Amino acid sequence: MISDFDRRRPVVRIVLGSTQFAVFLGVLVVGLGPILWTVKGALSPTQELIKDPVRLWPSQPAWAVLGKAWSDLRIGHFLLNTVLLAGGSWLVQLVVCFMGAYALSVLRPKMGRFLYGAVLATLFLPGSVSLVALYLTVLDLHLANTMWAVWLPAGAHAFTVLLMKRFFDGIPRELFGAAQVDGAGPWRLFWQIVLPMSKPIIAVVSLLTLMGAWKEFLWPMVAISDTEAHPISVALPRLAEFAEENTVIAGMFLALMPPVLVFIAFQKYIVRGVGFTGVKG
């Protein structure tokens, strides 16, 4: 630890400033590096991309490659599939996990501790362990090759329940007690107290859910056999066999932009929600 007196010394201030700048620069390179390389690869001719892959910027940017990737790889069609799959997964997971966390944190049933432990126990199970059982269940319910096969399993997400429960645990119990004295039941507590106060955690959970659903690869590939209904994460590797390298990278860039823009648009709410989640409970 550095005392306030030492912080006022010129040498210490220079060292601290240099260290902070170096750390910030490193984080910036690690975070933006892959995105910038994707932009560079998308605008580079295929021959230049192969001969000089570490070049910082193409000698003659080929902006037409983005349009070619959009039309040849049918990026718009597969992006629409991805939006539908991610949106449905987000809605199902938000409703199911919100209700589950509300019941465990606010209603607190008699077997609440046991149920909470059972939910957390699923965090230790790799997804590959339950893949076969999940697929057989989808077949039994005749949901294979439909979007419901992706939407419904998204509701069973223990980590989302954990995040929401921790947030709800931080709401003062006195609010619930006062509302119950006024005759409020479980649904009134939910609609008038819990839901209005949950905007920060809803923003965080929405981001995590959408990002996870957007990049999901294995389960959509297994559950949906129709190639026309595949999301962009499944379609791009298949289409890469028939397209040039720069066209594939341009498709990757176009697929990357929607979640990046969503994060930029809702960054304020997401950062605030992460802070609340880490402090409360």
Segments the model singles out, each with a brief description of its role:
Residues 2, 8-11, 16-281:
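A structural signal for multi-pass alpha-helical bundles of membrane permease subunits
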